Amino acid sequence: MAKEKYDRSKPHVNIGTIGHVDHGKTTLTAAITTVLARRLPSSVNQPKDYASIDAAPEERERGITINTAHVEYETEKRHYAHIDAPGHADYVKNMITGAAQMDGAILVVASTDGPMPQTREHILLSRQVGVKHLIVFMNKVDLVDDEELLELVEMEIRDLLSEYDFPGDDLPVIQGSALKALEGDSKYEDIVMELMNTVDEYIPEPERDTDKPLLLPVEDVFSITGRGTVASGRIDRGIVKVNDEIEIVGIKEETQKAVVTGVEMFRKQLDEGLAGDNVGVLLRGVQRDEIERGQVIAKPGSINPHTKFKGEVYILTKEEGGRHTPFFNNYRPQFYFRTTDVTGSIELPAGTEMVMPGDNVTIDVELIHPIAVEQGTTFSIREGGRTVGSGMVTEIEA
């Protein structure tokens, strides 16, 4: 069969498998790639076996060691990048650091066990970090003879999802066996195809970065005599055009307005800069000393400066280059947002005395000056220039 050309016209979606250890996440990932390769052969759909996915390479993301397997496959409608992490700690790190930005996820629950502690933790993390769409795959149904037991497990999963504000009564639950599908049992292969059909239908197409409101973290500022002030950086999301009205947000109490009079990339004038571009933006009505690294240039009204927020954080182990000792309430490290460090104090949840290296925890943070943040903004926690933790803003408080 001739190799097909990679089809870029298909929408691209990022998904992953989550759930308790040994419930079958990696087996399901292998089954999806294998069944799609059999049913929809293409250059993208290549079977991956359990061992190759399980031997996920170590990656360094913001100083943290994470093992993650990335596989790709396609359905008739979409192209998918799928993330599977071997260990529980890898999931926690992946989700909290934003290394794995999932548009949706497949929650794998073994029908023989029902929901377990990590099932709950992964659902909570999904809620915290903004994975809005979950599909349940009840695995290992071939090992359960009792139909009533399967119904009970399904009810238990739905209740648990509702507890964490997911639409537990309405979201799709598919019952199957990843191992049987992998082994070529056509009944269970059909179920994997049904699962992928459900993923196609239920997980909405993500908004493209260029459709989102402009956000450009300022890295450098200089003035050009006779022309004005230039701020440069990599556009995080959105588009910036000549004559756009923008806001300069963060560090200072007041948000400032300005107009873009030029956009440059590699010393060439552009009409517009897009998400991912490194640009210099010429601003009218802004003095050189009124804008600084650590601020962001944004679409007016799209993001505000804040000093207080809740965050979900992972604290590095000693082996990862983190702290050797725990920290306590009112710990005051630096919080590194995009391009700059800001000191802040940490309040631990009631009943938590201290946080050990390797822990993940929800914290309240108060920064000494405001930063442009929103739900989903990621940050590093640093001490004297070295990273000791990583986190994500889950809720704005002030």
Curated annotation (Swiss-Prot):
InterPro entries (alphabetical): EF-Tu_GTP-bd, EF-Tu_GTPase, EFTu-like_2, EFTU_2, G_TR_CS, P-loop_NTPase, Small_GTP-bd, T_Tr_GTP-bd_dom
Keywords: Cytoplasm, Elongation factor, GTP-binding, Hydrolase, Magnesium, Metal-binding, Nucleotide-binding, Protein biosynthesis
GO biological process: translational elongation
Start and end residues of each stretch annotated as G5: 177-179
Annotated residues for binding of GTP: 19-26, 84-88, 139-142
Chain intervals for the UniProt region annotation (G3): 84-87
GO cellular component: cytoplasm
Annotated region (G4), positions in chain: 139-142
Protein origin, superkingdom: Bacteria
Catalytic activity line of the entry: GTP + H2O = GDP + phosphate + H(+)
Subunit structure: Monomer.
Protein name: Elongation factor Tu
Recorded name of the encoding gene: tuf
